[in-house]
């Protein structure tokens, strides 16, 4: 994705109204709400690549005694906080949401790559599969390894029908601040918030 396109999309996302951020107090929140919008990039800017090469998210070695996060519950659409972002994406020609879902969980240990499948978190999301993981160490990280298959990829990507595109990335995140994960074929807007406001988050 070109710098110009990325800048325009970030402006769109960050310009959407979000609830005011809470003060980040003690870094000991145990349950987090995670909300994701996965959207298709219809513009196809970025140029042809070898789409058979699957990227791998960088990170530390697997810990000796990894802790796996616990799935708490699915969050209903009535409690979504990124609806304004979703609406703005729907009103563009180039970025169309393909899945919007949220859930609550505790964090896995840093480097464990222990997460939950899209099927568990989102149910039926045509063409979309993979895993999403939340890790806690010195900082909080949200990572994902997502596959998106479409019968009509954007022509600019020079990809055959049915090509499987892979987005694999892990990054440090801040609670209450939207994060953006991009790929020439599709992208993700993510928001992590503490489920219990009284405990804060890191």
Give residue ranges: language-model regions:
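Bacterial N-terminal signal peptides that target proteins for export
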Residues: 1-9
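N-terminal signal peptide c-region/cleavage motif recognized by signal peptidases
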Residues: 17-20
């Amino acid at each position: 994705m070109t710098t110009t396109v990325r800048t325009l999309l970030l402006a769109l996302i960050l310009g959407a109204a979000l609830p005011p951020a809470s003060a980040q107090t003690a870094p000991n929140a145990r349950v987090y709400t995670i909300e994701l919008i996965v959207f298709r990039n219809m513009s196809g800017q970025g140029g042809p690549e070898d789409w058979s090469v699957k990227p791998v998210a960088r990170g530390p070695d697997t810990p000796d005694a990894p802790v796996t996060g616990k799935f708490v519950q699915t969050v209903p659409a009535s409690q979504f906080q990124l609806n304004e972002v979703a609406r703005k994406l729907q009103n563009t020609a180039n970025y169309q949401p393909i899945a919007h879902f949220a859930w609550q969980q505790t964090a896995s240990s840093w480097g464990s790559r222990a997460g939950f499948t899209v099927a568990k978190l989102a149910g039926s999301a045509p063409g979309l599969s993979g895993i999403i993981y939340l890790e806690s160490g010195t900082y909080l990280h949200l990572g994902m390894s997502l596959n998106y298959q479409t019968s009509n990829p954007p022509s600019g990507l020079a990809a055959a029908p049915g090509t499987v595109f892979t987005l694999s990335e892990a990054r440090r995140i801040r609670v209450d601040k939207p994060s953006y994960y991009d790929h020439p074929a599709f992208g993700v807007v993510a928001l992590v918030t503490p489920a219990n406001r009284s405990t804060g988050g890191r």
